[in-house]
């Protein structure tokens, strides 16, 4: 009911920034209220999505050491695209979301960048291969350290971050496959699969 009232009062843009997990539902409601019919082109573009980001939800990579709460989140980086960038990369940069590892892994089984998987498959490991072979993006890791009361808001621009090295010196070690922090362009065969 709150969302419905908000739609009529014109505050949807504000709500959407908080409710990423209901993005598809809200898009459908907007289309319904606007009476939009999907064209063939818009149906194609629906295969490019940015996934659901829940940066303040619990992650397997979160931990507490000596009363300090540590969290690792990831952003699609660099925050720039070119004229030749893929639609997926453009949408990821534009969305400017902060993801947990689990959010990104969930995209591996969803159609978010159709056709870039092995043999043209619609799904593949976004965690390892981002926008697909030749992509210029990677997952940039951000380590947050919260002290005091509360859970810590990773979406806040004032959220305290520390370097990965500092976190490791304090006992917070998170290990990922090396490909997570690599651009597919810098991988063997530029991230493409040899057949």
Describe the residue ranges of each PLM region:
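Domain-core detector
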Residues: 1-134, 139-195
């Amino acid at each position: 009911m709150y969302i419905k009232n908000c739609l009529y009062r014109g505050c949807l843009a504000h709500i959407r920034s908080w409710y990423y997990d209901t993005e598809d539902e809200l898009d459908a409601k907007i289309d319904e209220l606007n009476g939009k019919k999907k064209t063939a082109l818009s149906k194609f573009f629906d295969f490019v999505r940015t996934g659901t980001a829940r940066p303040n939800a619990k992650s397997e990579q979160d931990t507490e050491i000596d009363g300090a709460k540590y969290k690792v989140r990831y952003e699609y980086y660099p925050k720039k695209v070119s004229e030749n960038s893929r639609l997926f990369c453009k949408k990821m940069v534009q969305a400017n979301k902060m993801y947990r590892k689990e959010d990104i892994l969930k995209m591996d089984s969803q159609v978010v960048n159709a056709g870039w998987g092995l043999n043209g498959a619609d799904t593949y490991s976004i965690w390892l291969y981002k926008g697909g072979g030749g992509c210029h993006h990677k997952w940039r890791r951000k380590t947050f350290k919260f002290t005091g009361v509360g859970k810590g808001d990773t979406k806040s621009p004032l959220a305290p971050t520390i370097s990965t090295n500092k976190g490791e010196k304090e006992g917070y070690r998170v290990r990922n496959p090396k490909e997570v922090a690599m651009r597919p362009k810098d991988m063997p065969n530029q991230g493409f699969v040899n057949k």
